[in-house]
Structures are given as structure tokens and as C-alpha cells.
Amino acid sequence: MKFTSVLAFFLATLTASATPLYKRQNVTSGGGTVPVIITGGPAVSGSQSNVTTTTLFNSTSTLNITQLYQIATQVNQTLQSESSSGIIIVTNWRSIETLSFFCSIVFNTSKTIVITENFLWGVPILSSSDAEGRGTLVAGRDKVVYSGVFPPYTVPVGVLSGQKNVQWFFDACEPTLIASNSTIRTQYSNFTSAQISSNASSGTNTSSSSSSPLVPIIYEEGYSQSLIQSLSSSIQGLVVVSSGTSHNSTVASWTSVDFPVVYASDGSSGHDGSGIGFISNTSIPQGAISAGYLSPIQAQTLLSIAIHNQVTSSSELQQIFPVSQQ
């Protein structure tokens, strides 16, 4: 079951994204305008006032790294407007985790970025003056506001009170991983570039670090030497979902592979189906990198961003994953 899912994901990510559809719709009434980017999910109702929508995709599957950077380009254009206090990005439920974490890393801004399945859930958040300076936020259907840096729906930072107000649980602050003095912000400011190389859409066979990296996720118990050999010529990085402690690992060492390998813990496999896992440097095979508290999908996203920006050495990657900050 898991191996089939991995192969399906692998094949899906091999497919280049289609040229995005840019469709603008203005829904007006008095007052300020709420900018909304649609990448999937329900359509914006034409009766809703003060909303300007830009439709990039109508995706029902998980957004790939090329699509994420295309979204980033559009978001940058919107955030550069002096009249913009932030933006709402609507996506499908499968992409909530990937998109919210990607935006957390790529956008170094105090302006509010809200990721949601329904733009109506994001409007009160964007309208709140206290939303700024918290990093990317996720608006859930349960009326709770979550941090986009952590696995989805695990770290609440506020709750909708009524239909228009947000009750924040604490004063605005950014998570350590993306704080202004963090390693990512001080040493890897190029991560905030929203541009993807033109090589990503060209027909030339260039280095993956200058195009769209392919970073699949596999489960440790499904590991086999033949699987790695079949993937090694096509992938630029790998995320392994840990099966437990180091003495249970089916792999002794990853030092012989020529791509970075990150081990992550799946907190969603807990008894309640959700949560935050953690894996330390002492719980992984030699040559691998620990994702710390990041979920497998978040580890995949951060590793893809790093490879895209030509950060591939083990020493550099160890600095940007949160386990180094423990």
C-alpha cells in the first residue's frame, strides 16, 4: 500500500506542470480589496465583496515544486504593492501542508499570508492588524488559525471569534526556524528568491540544482537496494520516513549515495492521527540528515528548496533543519 503510494507520487512529480492559467476576477463593493490567489479548492463566489482573485491552477493533487515557485512569483507581485497588507492563497486539502511550509520558508515578510481551502475562512485573518509578523498562517475549517511552519493543524495560534474577529493566543512572533536571526534568514537569504530557473522549462539536460529537483518520499520499511538503484539516476534528494530508533533501521549507511538523504518522523501515525514527531541525529543512519520536528512532507519541501538553490552538502543541510537548533 505504502510502496504503491510512493510510486504514484514519484510518477506524478516526474510530470512537468502545465502552463498555468491566469484568470483575474474582480468582485467589488466599497472598502479595501482582499487579494486571493486560487490554486485549487472551491471557486470564489461572485457575490462576495472586496475580493480580487487570480486563478493560477485548479489543481486537485499535491502541488509540485515548479507550481510552488510559480505561485511564489505571483505572491511576490502582490506583496510588493504598498496597498497590500497580505494575501490569501486558496488550495486543495492535499496541498495545505506543502504550500504553507513553502511560503513560510520562501517569503521573508511581515505581511500576512494565509493558506486555506476556502477564502472565506481567511478573510478575518487577513483583516486583523495583529496577524502580521507571525509567518504564514493556515485557516482551518474548525475556525482555528494555525502556524504554517509546523505540520498542519498541530500548533494553533488563534481562533475566529464570530465571523469577523480573531482572538490571538499570544503576541505576534515568528517561529525559530524562520526568525530574523535564524540560519535560514541570515545565511541562506537566497531561499527567499521566488524565481525558478528557465532551465526548468527547457529541453536541455541541466543540473537539477538549477531546475526543479525531484525529491521522493519512501518508508524505511519499504527500502530495498534495488529501489534505490532504480531511483538514483532520476532523483536529486530523498526523504525517508523513519520506522523508529537507529537499531531498527534497515539501512546501515547512506554515505555511498550521491544525493542528500533526510530522515523524518511521521507524527500523524500516532494514536490520534495527528501530531508532531521528532527524530534526532542519533536515531538515523550514517550519512543521513535529521529533519527534527518537520514532517516528511515538510522535509521534502525544505530539501527541494535547498537543492533548487544549490545547497546540497551534508554540512549545509544540517544547519537549516531544525534539529541543529535544539
UniProtKB/Swiss-Prot annotation:
Residues 19-324 form the Asparaginase/glutaminase domain. The keyword Disulfide bond does not apply. Glycans are attached at N26, N50, N58, N64, N76, N108, N181, N190, N199, N205, N248, N281. Keywords: Glycoprotein, Signal, Sporulation. The keyword Lipid metabolism does not apply. Residues 1-18 form the signal peptide. One of its GO terms (biological process) is ascospore wall assembly. To yeast YGP1. The program of events of meiosis and spore formation reflects the sequential expression of at least four temporally distinct classes of sporulation-specific genes, SPS100 and SPS101 genes define a distinct class of very late sporulation genes. This is Sporulation-specific wall maturation protein.
